[in-house]
Amino acid sequence: MPFWYSNSKLIWLLSPFSLLFWLISQLRHALFCLGIKSSYRAPKPVIIVGNLSVGGNGKTPVVVWLVEELKKRGLRVGVISRGYGSKSKTYPLFVTENTRPIEGGDEPVLIAKRTNAPVVISPNRQQAIELLLSQAECDIIVSDDGLQHYKLQRDLEIVVMDAERALGNGFVLPAGPLRELPSRLKSVDFVITNGGKNQYSDAVMYLVPHFAINLKTNEKRQLKEFQSGVAIAGIGNPQRFFTMLEKLGIQLERTQAFQDHQHFEASQLEKLAENQPLFMTEKDAVKCQSFAKDNWWYVPVDAEIIEAEKQCENLPHFWGKIDKLVAQYRNG
């Protein structure tokens, strides 16, 4: 919502509801901390990758990066997710790159495709972990989202934040974009800011595009070969994708933003770009592959994550925590 990042009067009109939201969430958190409500401890270490605010912060590229880095260290990694946008009739569901996005959710299918890691979705994270461990050998589990899902105990927490929008107006829902108060950042292990650094950054992520891939033929083409086109995006922050393409020198004749996790129909997109290249995100592409046209291209990005400050050693410290954590579980 635009007013989340402004001084709109709507903020004060909605602030009583935000107070109620905060009280309920605080009570719920306290009940888990005191053991009044039960929580689940997985038999393997769990890393949460989540957000403090709603909207597109860049969580999925961080999950992909984390899984790939853990695998480089010789660890067998499994991924669980709520599977937002999934319409599966049964849960938990084992997701592969061939799972229909309407069943598996666009982000879990993308993660499975990019990492080749076992992925299981379910609103019940315990059931997701139990199915995951029954069908795959895992040394460590990455939870895609779930920072506020206190029913699942965790060993490390990573928060991903948009560097520019940060925490918005600082209010919790619905007056602001936050799911919890900014003070929650004091208890997480690592903060990655997307697109630059701010006062909260432990590390900074830049999303790096290398080429465009044709949805129908899988042809790869350098982005500099394109002069113009049309772009669509059904992600949390569509403008970030459009701006990226323009910075690469592509003149966008038209842009069309859709809601996050949009379910696309061929007719929606065909009329947008009949004779021009149509660019979309990789997340959108997994939902459009089955009815793709010759002029449709997606632009995959890789997460490049660096220290927030040159003299810092936040990343080595973070990996040291993970090494220690895995060793503790292996030694019982």
Curated annotation (Swiss-Prot):
Organism: Haemophilus influenzae (strain PittEE)
Gene transcribed to yield this protein: lpxK
PANTHER family: TETRAACYLDISACCHARIDE 4'-KINASE, TETRAACYLDISACCHARIDE 4'-KINASE, MITOCHONDRIAL-RELATED
Annotated InterPro entries: LpxK (IPR003758), P-loop_NTPase (IPR027417)
Residues given in the record as ATP binding sites: 53-60
EC id: 2.7.1.130
Name recorded for this polypeptide: Tetraacyldisaccharide 4'-kinase
Catalytic activity of the protein: a lipid A disaccharide + ATP = a lipid IVA + ADP + H(+)
Family membership: Belongs to the LpxK family.
Keyword annotations from UniProtKB, A to Z: ATP-binding, Kinase, Lipid A biosynthesis, Lipid biosynthesis, Lipid metabolism, Nucleotide-binding, Transferase
Metabolic or biological pathway: Glycolipid biosynthesis; lipid IV(A) biosynthesis; lipid IV(A) from (3R)-3-hydroxytetradecanoyl-[acyl-carrier-protein] and UDP-N-acetyl-alpha-D-glucosamine: step 6/6
Native organism taxonomy: Bacteria, Pseudomonadati, Pseudomonadota, Gammaproteobacteria, Pasteurellales
GO terms for biological process, alphabetical: lipid A biosynthetic process; lipopolysaccharide core region biosynthetic process
Gene Ontology molecular function, alphabetical: ATP binding; tetraacyldisaccharide 4'-kinase activity
Function according to Swiss-Prot or TrEMBL: Transfers the gamma-phosphate of ATP to the 4'-position of a tetraacyldisaccharide 1-phosphate intermediate (termed DS-1-P) to form tetraacyldisaccharide 1,4'-bis-phosphate (lipid IVA).
Cellular component aspect of the GO annotation: plasma membrane
